[in-house]
Amino acid sequence: MKILKVKYLHDYKLEVLFTNGKITTTDFEMFLTNSKNKCINKFLDKEKFKTVTVDNGFLSWNDGEMEISARSVYNDFSIDTQFANY
């Protein structure tokens, strides 16, 4: 499973489309807030967080400075899941 598309929603929430046809709403607020890693904490700046892209099926920020795998996004950050309506 890989990520096909990502769309910024608001705050630290994203809408993510996976190759399995599912769309999830994800929330990264707790992850970013609780991290003790300075490289991760800087994405608490919403303008930096909004720069998310898809790179080789991963969520990626700042040219790979922070990357999160599709499996981790799906299993650890999803708060709502539905099938895409094609």
Set out the residue ranges of the language-model regions.
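Motif-centric detector for short Cys/His coordination patterns
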Residues: 1-86
